[in-house]
Amino acid sequence: MFGKAGLGGLMKQAQQMQENMKKAQAKLAETEIEGEAGNGLVKITMTCAHEVRKIDISPDLIQEAADDKEMLEDLILAALKSARDKAEETANKTMGAFAQGLPPGVGDFFR
């Protein structure tokens, strides 16, 4: 089905694709996104590899939530989910580019 040259070219192409994927994954591990809740009262910064780097809670919210621990917890959770969703979206867009042109289903292995 493949000649020596065809198979060799295919292997070289696969190796190049793997190297490019590793570079993209490394870049995603450093790419920071921000999720927020409560109109910016709670902000969470995380990488596209889901490493939380920063949690910022507005001083105004801390005063308001002094007697409402549950509200503060809900806002932190909502900001975390927002950040996670943005990280997933960014990662899927980046890694999805590697799946273009592959047979159906094969691209799922690269996500």
From Swiss-Prot:
Transcription among keywords: no
Oligomeric and partner information: Homodimer.
Pfam families attached to this UniProt entry: YbaB_DNA_bd
Stated family: Belongs to the YbaB/EbfC family.
UniProt lineage: Bacteria, Pseudomonadati, Pseudomonadota, Betaproteobacteria, Neisseriales
Record carries keyword Phosphoprotein: no
The protein, known as: Nucleoid-associated protein NMCC_1355
Location(s), subcellular: Cytoplasm, Nucleoid
Record-annotated disulphide pairs: none
